[in-house]
Amino acid sequence: MTELQNYIDGYGFGISVKELASRAYSHMAAKGHKVCIVNDRYLEVDGTTYLFSKSRKHGRWIAKAI
């Protein structure tokens, strides 16, 4: 989801994955999406589960649909 990826692009590696998931949850819920936190690394948005991982190659967080 482009909206989720664009949101987390604003965060560097100084934030924990748990905090990132929490902030992404709040942002997406405020935008009117159906959201739930599966666990520290996973967020479900509108029925699709996303894994948050670090991309050292690109120097940013990645939200990958699984």
Protein language model regions, located:
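Hydrophobic transmembrane signal anchors and adjacent membrane-proximal interface regions, especially
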Residues: 6, 15, 35-38, 43, ...
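Intrinsically disordered, low-complexity regulatory segments enriched in Ser/Thr/Pro
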Residues: 53-66
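Acidic, low-complexity, intrinsically disordered interaction modules
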Residues: 21-56
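N-terminal acidic leader/helix
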Residues: 2-30
